[in-house]
Every structure is written in structure tokens, then in C-alpha cells.
């Protein structure tokens, strides 16, 4: 389908992903999910099969009294009973089975991260892994370690980050025109004329939605490929020769080689975006470091983990794992060997180096 899309890699490894023992006697996780209804067994809303959420609860990484700010208590007994269905066939304790479920879910997610980075020639080791979603913080340290990454971040409002982004996302239009021809057979004026037509249409639509003409930013790009290929690469529009040279470089960077073939134009694209809505978030005050409100035992760890309320953390405060950081819409598990520093905006900056 020749429409602009966000390049995403989706896997079945959410908090509702169901664990089971397959016909070969192997523990599997996902892609089947319990969803929100009936949900994980620990929701006590009719779900009977073990999920990743149940596993995190049994390992002590989820607080049964802190889920949704304590408004929705989690039932450990229901999670325990559900996890027995995979523990017994494998000859494992319930806690061992829960640990296996989390490890398999982590590996599914780590593999997806490798597909989006290593397999595309991107070395993730110098990057920061950003975690969001209600369960993202429970797995972020393990995923960063799996990719040899030393830094991660759990942004403020992580559990509802997608909804927040939707609310402040700018109005936009993406328009395209298919025109298959050898790039160097096209005239610069011919391409400019198509762009002008697309821009006029998109600008008119945004103005009709109340966007001021002066607030519209325009981005021109084109899809190019080698003649005979079935896939293409998108590049910003400049001029014919510059785009041809840039395509050769990008193809070599993405696929490891370039070809001595004519470059073919496939689509001309225009993106029109209004100025984003200013987002003002409350800054955290600096002050005395808050203290944990509890200590909990986590399966597999000799030392107890401190439990902090995220809304009580101060700017500049530093934490050492193992620790749990709870909030209404998510929980962050700071694994042993990891450190957390709270920035002025309230983001949790994680690192496995001092």
C-alpha cells in the first residue's frame, strides 16, 4: 500500500501475553493475549491462564497494593494458581516458572530491538533505551543489558505516554503522487510543479481545520529505487543530482552495497505539519531525597529492594538497584547493578555504570 507509515516492529509480548507449555514440552509466551478482559489471572476478573503480568507479580516486581494507585488490587493467589498450570508440567516451582516467563518475554522484545537496530547496521550500545507503557519499566533494565546498552530512560507519565503524545501531536497531512520514471529523465521544473500542486491541496485542508497559513511547515521527499527493485528508500528532495548521489549512499549504508543501475523515481511526497502545541510539564523541585516507603523481597535476590513512590522523588535524587519505583500508571524495576537519577522534569535516567 503506497501510503506513508510509521516503521514499527510489533510483537506479542505485552503484560497480557499468555504463557503455556507447547506440545514439545517447551515453555512459550505469546502471541496470544488475555487482553484487558478478562485480563491476567491476578486481575481476578475471570482470567485463568498465566500471563507476563502474573509472572511479575509473583516475582515481587509488581506491588499488589499499588496497581492503578491502589484502586485495583492484584490477587497473588489467582496468579499463583494460574502459574501452576505451566510450572507442574515443567517440574518447576511457581516462582521458577514465573522467572522463565519473564525471561522469554524479554528475549522476544530484545530480538525485536535487534531487528530494528543491529540488523539495520545501527549499533545500539551508545544509545539510550526509552521505555514507556504501564509495564515497560518492569523490563527496561533487562532489555538494555541484552543489547549491551548502558543507559535507559523512563519518561515522566510513561504509562500514558502514547495518549499524551496524541493530545499534543500537531495536525498534519501526508500527500503523495506516484510517478515512475528514471530520475535523471525528469526535469527539475516538472517535479517542482507536482510538489506545488500537492502543497496547495494540503495547505487548503489544514487551513480548513483552523491552522494558520504561517504555522504550516512543509517537507518534501521522494521515494527512489534501483531500476528493477520492488522496494524503495525515502530521501528529502533537493535537486536531481544531489538526490541520486544521496540514494547511492543511503542504499550502501542500509544494505551494505550500491549498484551500477539507473535510479528510478517512484513517488513524490509532501508532508505538511502545523506547529506543535506547546507542552508544559511541571518541574520537580530540588530538596532532601525522599526515603523508601517499604522494603520487599524479590525472588532470586538475597538483598531486599527499596520501594519508592515516584511522585515523592526530588530532582537530582539518585537511587541504587534493586528498587521498585511505583506510580499510578506504571512500575519501574531498577535491577541490581543499575542506578537511577531523577532529572528536573521527573524523568528517570537509568545507567548500569557509576
What spans do the regions from the language model cover?
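Nucleotide/phosphate-binding site architecture used for ATP/NTP-dependent chemistry
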Residues: 44
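Conserved P-loop NTPase motor core
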Residues: 2-3, 11, 15, 19-22
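C-terminal, non-catalytic interaction/recognition modules in large multi-subunit enzymes and RNPs
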Residues: 14, 23-24, 29, 34-38, ...
Amino acid at each position: 500500500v503506497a501510503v506513508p507509515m510509521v516503521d514499527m516492529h510489533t510483537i506479542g509480548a505485552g503484560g497480557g501475553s499468555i504463557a503455556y507449555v507447547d506440545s514439545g514440552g517447551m515453555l512459550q509466551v505469546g502471541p496470544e493475549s488475555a487482553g484487558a478482559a478478562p485480563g491476567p489471572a491476578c486481575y481476578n476478573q475471570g482470567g485463568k491462564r498465566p500471563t507476563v503480568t502474573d509472572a511479575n507479580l509473583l516475582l515481587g516486581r509488581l506491588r499488589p497494593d499499588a496497581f492503578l494507585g491502589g484502586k485495583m488490587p492484584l490477587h497473588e493467589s489467582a496468579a499463583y494458581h494460574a502459574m501452576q498450570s505451566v510450572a507442574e508440567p515443567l517440574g518447576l516451582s511457581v516462582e521458577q516458572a514465573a522467572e522463565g516467563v519473564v525471561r522469554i518475554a524479554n528475549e522476544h522484545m530484545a530480538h525485536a530491538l535487534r531487528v530494528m537496530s543491529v540488523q539495520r547496521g545501527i549499533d545500539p550500545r551508545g544509545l539510550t533505551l526509552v521505555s514507556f507503557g504501564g509495564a515497560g519499566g518492569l523490563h527496561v533494565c533487562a532489555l538494555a543489558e541484552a543489547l549491551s546498552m548502558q543507559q535507559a530512560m523512563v519518561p515522566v507519565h510513561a504509562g500514558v505516554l502514547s495518549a499524551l503524545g496524541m493530545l499534543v501531536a500537531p495536525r498534519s497531512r501526508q500527500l503523495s503522487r506516484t510517478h515512475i520514471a528514471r530520475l535523471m529523465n525528469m526535469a527539475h521544473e516538472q517535479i517542482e510543479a507536482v510538489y506545488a500542486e500537492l502543497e496547495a491541496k494540503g495547505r487548503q485542508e489544514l487551513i480548513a481545520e483552523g491552522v494558520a497559513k504561517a504555522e504550516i511547515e512543509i517537507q518534501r521527499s521522494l521515494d527512489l529505487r534501483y531500476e528493477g527493485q520492488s522496494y524503495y528508500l525515502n530521501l528529502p528532495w533537493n535537486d536531481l543530482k544531489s538526490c541520486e548521489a544521496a540514494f547511492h549512499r543511503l542504499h550502501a549504508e542500509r544494505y551494505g552495497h550500491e549498484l551500477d543501475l539507473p535510479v528510478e523515481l517512484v513517488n513524490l511526497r509532501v508532508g505538511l505539519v502545523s506547529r506543535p502545541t506547546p507542552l508544559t510539564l511541571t518541574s520537580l523541585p530540588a530538596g532532601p531525597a525522599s526515603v523508601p516507603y517499604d522494603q520487599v523481597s524479590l525472588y532470586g535476590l538475597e538483598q531486599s529492594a527499596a520501594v519508592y513512590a515516584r511522585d515523592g522523588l526530588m530532582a537530582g535524587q539518585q537511587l541504587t538497584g534493586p528498587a521498585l519505583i511505583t506510580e499510578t500508571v506504571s512500575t519501574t524495576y531498577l535491577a541490581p547493578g543499575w542506578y537511577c537519577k531523577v532529572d528536573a522534569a521527573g524523568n528517570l535516567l537509568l545507567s548500569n555504570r557509576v
